[in-house]
């Protein structure tokens, strides 16, 4: 038996204004070069823009967008007998949220527009409505998993 202690899983902290873990996860993914205050500014501006566009609670729009982009299943490359197969695997809720946030930010960065806050707010509103690049990415992932269903037994 090992003498090493067990490590407790870290829980995501909540942000200072909205007291929301999802907001904090999003800020940590926006973060570049350790400039966290800038990441907070970008997200809070985006939230303000969402409030102006939709005239509803921006946090509910954020939750709806992330829920709409979160994948249930993904494909993972696995080598079997010299050939690589795309094996569909189920994704847990935490990993799914992390993927959804990554896809939302990637889609927002690709968008044309003035600044990141504007692009992020547009992408979040689109994702909440069920359109946008991030939702397309999720559907594409699900299609890939469905197409490679025959390899599910390689898990």
Swiss-Prot record:
Cell compartments where the protein resides: Plastid, Chloroplast
Complexes and interactors: Component of the chloroplast small ribosomal subunit (SSU). Mature 70S chloroplast ribosomes of higher plants consist of a small (30S) and a large (50S) subunit. The 30S small subunit contains 1 molecule of ribosomal RNA (16S rRNA) and 24 different proteins. The 50S large subunit contains 3 rRNA molecules (23S, 5S and 4.5S rRNA) and 33 different proteins.
Superkingdom assignment: Eukaryota
BP GO annotations: ribosomal small subunit assembly; translation
Database matches in Pfam families: Ribosomal_S7
InterPro entries in alphabetical order: Ribosomal_uS7, Ribosomal_uS7_bac/org-type, Ribosomal_uS7_CS, Ribosomal_uS7_dom, Ribosomal_uS7_dom_sf
GO (cellular component) term, any one: chloroplast
Species this protein is from: Spinacia oleracea
Coiled-coil region(s): none
Its job: Component of the chloroplast ribosome (chloro-ribosome), a dedicated translation machinery responsible for the synthesis of chloroplast genome-encoded proteins, including proteins of the transcription and translation machinery and components of the photosynthetic apparatus.
SUPFAM superfamilies, per database record: Ribosomal protein S7
Keywords: Chloroplast, Plastid, Ribonucleoprotein, Ribosomal protein, RNA-binding, rRNA-binding
Name by which UniProt lists this protein: Small ribosomal subunit protein uS7cz/uS7cy
Main location class: plastid
Alphabetized GO MF terms: mRNA binding; rRNA binding; structural constituent of ribosome
Protein family membership: Belongs to the universal ribosomal protein uS7 family.
